[in-house]
Amino acid sequence: MVQALSSYRSLSFWHDTVGDDLTPRSSLDGDLDVDVAIVGGGLTGLWTAWSLLQAAPGTRVVILEREIAGFGASGRNGGWCSALFPTSSTGLAAKHGRDAAVAMRRAMINTVDEVGRAAAAAGIDCDFVKRGTVVYARDEVQRRAAMADVAATEAFGAGLDGVDTLEWWGPDRVRAAGAVGATFDPACARLHPAK
């Protein structure tokens, strides 16, 4: 379903500020002969197409998107490229083994840097800046959970070999009203996802 251009701009801050033409491309008018068809023009679909073409430049790739690139969650997110993961390394290790937990954390960290490198190599000015993220703990329960995350990160060696690692910042360093401390994760960047 094709929507009016103004409605795409109202989807999110990112669409409103991108400055590009948000007119949907025309529908397919026939069959295509391609090697790979990717359904969805979000970050995952675009990244997959880019990666395929980097690995095999002659590959015939098409991205099929009903609306516009970044229409769904990719264009309505917080603008973060982060190695934060909803499960701890301890939880991953319990289910998949220690090596898999370490590999996952390292892959998450390396992906943040790879996104920055890829954007620069492709000449995409997406306002990529990697400066980390701070997550505040405001009570004892949050402090204990944060300390467990830091300990798990250290125990699983994700900070070895110069790879970024999670740090605990005490209240003297945080100096935020009501905070008992915070974690700092250097493996986080901000970017403009609609660019």
Predicted segments — roles?
Residues 2-10, 16-18, 87-94, 117-195:
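Flavin (FAD/FMN) cofactor-binding and adjacent substrate-gating region
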Residues 53-76:
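Glycine-rich FAD pyrophosphate-binding loop
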Residues 1-36, 54-60:
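Extreme N-terminal leader/targeting segments of oxidoreductases
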Residues 40-46, 66:
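Glycine-rich Rossmann-fold phosphate-binding loop(s) that bind the pyrophosphate
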